[in-house]
UniProtKB/Swiss-Prot annotation:
Keywords, in A-Z order: Ribonucleoprotein, Ribosomal protein, RNA-binding, rRNA-binding
Gene name per UniProt: rpsH
InterPro entries documented for this protein: Ribosomal_uS8, Ribosomal_uS8_CS, Ribosomal_uS8_sf
Protein name in UniProt: Small ribosomal subunit protein uS8
Job of this protein: One of the primary rRNA binding proteins, it binds directly to 16S rRNA central domain where it helps coordinate assembly of the platform of the 30S subunit.
Family matches, as SUPFAM superfamilies: Ribosomal protein S8
Molecular functions (GO terms): rRNA binding; structural constituent of ribosome
GO CC annotations on file: ribonucleoprotein complex; ribosome
Gene Ontology terms describing biological process: translation
Subunit structure as annotated in this protein's UniProt entry: Part of the 30S ribosomal subunit. Contacts proteins S5 and S12.
Length: 131
């Protein structure tokens, strides 16, 4: 069976891994998934990520982050999905948890956080919320 929404699968693997107190989670790799992992690392939500190639299949391993035994990622939620794309202009970009969380936005300049997109004066597709 083919995977309908690989980004939702990635976010669910991270959510489930942290609920089970796993050190890391593995998933099939893709450019968009690596870009999301890079943003999560830059914003301090995960410890690290690595891409390993096994034959013709690349695998993304995300090392999860905990603070005092609790997951750093409290909520991670898919917004735009294949059946219902959500686009927001630069003035309509949401502030997640009043600015404490981030929204990952796909713009014409690549993936960036909602703060970076506002500073760049760009809108785009809202991929997910992380808090």
């Amino acid at each position: 069976m083919s995977m309908q929404d690989p980004i939702a699968d990635m976010l669910t693997r991270i959510r489930n891994g942290q609920a089970a107190n796993k050190v890391s989670v593995k998933m099939p790799s893709a450019k968009l998934k690596v870009a999301i992992a890079k943003l999560l690392k830059d914003e301090g939500y995960i410890t690290d990520y690595a891409v390993a190639s096994e034959g013709n299949k690349a695998e993304l391993e995300v090392t999860l982050k905990y603070f005092q035994g609790r997951p750093v990622v409290e909520t991670i939620q898919r917004v735009s999905r294949p059946g219902l794309r959500i686009y927001k202009g630069k003035d309509e970009l949401p502030k997640v948890m009043g600015g404490l969380g981030i929204a990952i936005v796909s713009t014409s300049k690549g993936l960036m956080t909602d703060r970076a997109a506002r500073l760049a004066g760009m809108g785009g597709e809202v991929i997910c919320y992380v808090a």
